[in-house]
Amino acid sequence: LGEFAPTRTYRGHDKKDNKKDNKKGQKK
């Protein structure tokens, strides 16, 4: 549950591309 949610999806994606999302998240 919560996979459709924006926060849950973002967290799951961040875990997969933690290194890639980390750079994007820090820039944001």
Swiss-Prot record:
Stretches assigned to coiled coil: none
Amino acid composition bias (Basic and acidic residues), ranges on this chain: 11-28
GO cellular component: ribonucleoprotein complex; ribosome
UniProt KW keywords: Ribonucleoprotein, Ribosomal protein, RNA-binding, rRNA-binding
Disulfide bridge partners, by residue number: none
Chain intervals for the UniProt region annotation (Disordered): 1-28
A GO MF label: rRNA binding
Similarity comment: Belongs to the universal ribosomal protein uS19 family.
Known role: Protein S19 forms a complex with S13 that binds strongly to the 16S ribosomal RNA.
Protein's UniProt name: Small ribosomal subunit protein uS19
